[in-house]
Amino acid sequence: MSELIIGVDPGTIVAGYAIIAVEQRYQLRPYSYGAIRLSSDMPLPMRYKTLFEQLSGVLDDTQPNAMVLETQFVNKNPQSTMKLAMARGIVLLAAAQRDILIFEYAPNVAKKAVVGKGHASKRQVQVMVSKILNVPEVLHPSNEDIADAFALAICHTHVARSPLCGVR
């Protein structure tokens, strides 16, 4: 039986998610992926509600074993940081309600796991995710969030199987 890992790249306009199946001998296979697209015309509370409902549906349908997110960061605009933090909270709540294990990695750790360098561009992440999992759809510019979500899930599989890590 394979283990399912969901990576989530939360956002207030687009939230990408990607589930990989970890097969025997750590072979990775794309299981399910997509983007929850939220209209900027919607009031923010309605976007959070929609994010929660749609992500909850994905989690209920797929029942992943673990969820992976980027660690919180602070950007130059405090208002944007707060909005993103609330979206992260919605994602964390959806996972916690279902007793899904939650793991967090810094963006540069996820990039290094997939591309080999921590300061890789979004495009480099898309290209490597496409090659690793044979998912050409992530190369489309509108699917950056899905590629980031895949990168987080891939990163977790690398860290979790490391004998130097106490995650497993």
Curated annotation (Swiss-Prot):
An annotated GO BP: DNA recombination
Cofactor(s) required, per the database record: Mg(2+)
Comment on bound cofactor: Binds 2 Mg(2+) ion per subunit.
Alphabetized GO MF terms: crossover junction DNA endonuclease activity; DNA binding; magnesium ion binding
GO CC terms: cytoplasm; Holliday junction resolvase complex
Catalytic reaction(s) noted: Endonucleolytic cleavage at a junction such as a reciprocal single-stranded crossover between two homologous DNA duplexes (Holliday junction)
Top-level EC class as recorded in UniProt: hydrolase
Pfam families given in the database record: RuvC
Compartments (UniProt record): Cytoplasm
Keywords: Cytoplasm, DNA damage, DNA recombination, DNA repair, DNA-binding, Endonuclease, Hydrolase, Magnesium, Metal-binding, Nuclease
Family: Belongs to the RuvC family.
Complex and partners: Homodimer which binds Holliday junction (HJ) DNA. The HJ becomes 2-fold symmetrical on binding to RuvC with unstacked arms; it has a different conformation from HJ DNA in complex with RuvA. In the full resolvosome a probable DNA-RuvA(4)-RuvB(12)-RuvC(2) complex forms which resolves the HJ.
Biological function: The RuvA-RuvB-RuvC complex processes Holliday junction (HJ) DNA during genetic recombination and DNA repair. Endonuclease that resolves HJ intermediates. Cleaves cruciform DNA by making single-stranded nicks across the HJ at symmetrical positions within the homologous arms, yielding a 5'-phosphate and a 3'-hydroxyl group; requires a central core of homology in the junction. The consensus cleavage sequence is 5'-(A/T)TT(C/G)-3'. Cleavage occurs on the 3'-side of the TT dinucleotide at the point of strand exchange.
Protein's name according to its UniProt entry: Crossover junction endodeoxyribonuclease RuvC
Organism whose genome encodes this protein: Chlamydia pneumoniae (Chlamydophila pneumoniae)
Lineage of source species: Bacteria, Pseudomonadati, Chlamydiota, Chlamydiia, Chlamydiales
